[in-house]
């Protein structure tokens, strides 16, 4: 698809008018929900994403082959974890010499210290653990430090966010910086903020992490997704998370 057609598709968004963006205030995807869906997200009993959080809590307390569980170090239900530190992810690991997402840190810690069966990044149980741990920082402001050693990865993620993808030939920022609140191919667009992830998606009927959501977007643009946990997705997560700085964590958010 050529660029004239892809531009026409974007301008077909309901009421589309190009306007300058980033520099605008960060707005959570929560703001684009109906009042009924906001109420559902806010109610722990009604929020379907809480099932994934509860599954993660069970895994957190399950001992591995050496008899240790995540709770052995981090307290019952993660009581010893610092919500402010959770809100700083992704962070740069001096030991690994690369950025580490929250899910990657959980898997690294679990695989090294509990002697449980190793989990892959794309494993459903890895997503459940991430949802549980991030839920512990509910209401904490996202606070990713994109300076210092993360700066190069922030810039790499920004370049990817501004790269045109696939046969549809559209970049992430074209939808999420310019057309938030409008629809594209029947999909309500938001700013693409990360503060609600992992989120429950009504269109999928399941909880997805940020990288899973990026893969869905690339597939919709007829582009080849990267593997979950890849350098490209990690750089994108660094950029998108820093872009959400100041927004309160809502995990598990509800999104369309």
Language model region names:
Residues 69-82, 86-89, 147-148:
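Acidic helix-start/capping segments at beta-turn-to-alpha-helix junctions
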Residues 67-71, 79-81, 185-188, 254-255:
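Extended intrinsically disordered, low-complexity coil regions enriched in Ser, Thr, Gly, Ala
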Residues 44-76:
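N-terminal, post-signal-peptide region of Sec/Tat-exported proteins
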Residues 2-52, 79, 90-155, 181, ...:
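Post-cleavage N-terminal segment of exported redox proteins
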């Amino acid at each position: 698809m050529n660029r004239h057609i892809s531009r026409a598709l974007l301008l077909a968004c309901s009421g589309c008018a190009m306007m300058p963006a980033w520099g605008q205030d960060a707005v959570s995807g929560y703001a684009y929900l109906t009042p009924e869906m906001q109420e559902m997200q806010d109610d722990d009993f009604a929020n379907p994403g809480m099932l994934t959080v509860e599954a993660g809590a069970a895994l957190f307390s399950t001992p591995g082959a050496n008899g240790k569980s995540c709770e052995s170090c981090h307290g019952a239900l993660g009581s010893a974890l610092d919500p402010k530190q959770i809100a700083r992810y992704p962070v740069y690991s001096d030991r690994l010499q690369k950025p580490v997402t929250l899910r990657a840190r959980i898997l690294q810690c679990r695989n090294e210290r509990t002697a449980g069966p190793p989990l892959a990044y794309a494993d459903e149980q890895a997503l459940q653990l991430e949802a549980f741990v991030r839920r512990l920082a509910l209401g904490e402001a996202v606070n990713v430090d994109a300076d210092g050693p993360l700066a190069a990865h922030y810039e790499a993620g920004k370049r990817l966010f501004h790269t045109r993808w696939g046969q549809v030939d559209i970049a992430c920022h074209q939808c999420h910086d310019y057309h938030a609140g409008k629809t594209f191919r029947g999909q309500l667009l938001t700013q693409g903020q990360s503060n609600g992830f992992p989120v429950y998606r009504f269109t999928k009927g399941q909880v997805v992490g940020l990288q899973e959501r990026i893969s869905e977007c690339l597939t919709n643009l007829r582009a080849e997704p990267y593997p979950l946990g890849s350098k490209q997705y990690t750089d994108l997560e660094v950029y998108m998370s820093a872009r959400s700085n100041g927004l309160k964590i809502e995990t598990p958010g509800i999104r369309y």
